[in-house]
């Protein structure tokens, strides 16, 4: 990975953490998470990458932003992204410690993603005897 891109990823996670930190101890998990998501998405969209979120905030119909399959960036190398803008929403809302922003980036098609339950055809599974 390009050294400059690695430094930019530090900035992305830092921006998300700082946005969430404004909600420490305020009791509102959704506001803390939304602040982190908004900040991380804004930063990701400023990078010169063609990114695809492969591990994110959930399926498209469950998460308005940073959902699995969402495209981010301004164009550049194709990359897969795994992220959690705020790991520890309850901790943050209650004023606790050790919440974090998480992001990983790899070349296109190199991050493993497990299939969602919707992708599994259970009728093809052998029945247990």
PLM features: residue spans?
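Hydrophobic alpha-helical segments, chiefly the membrane-spanning helices
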Residues: 124-129
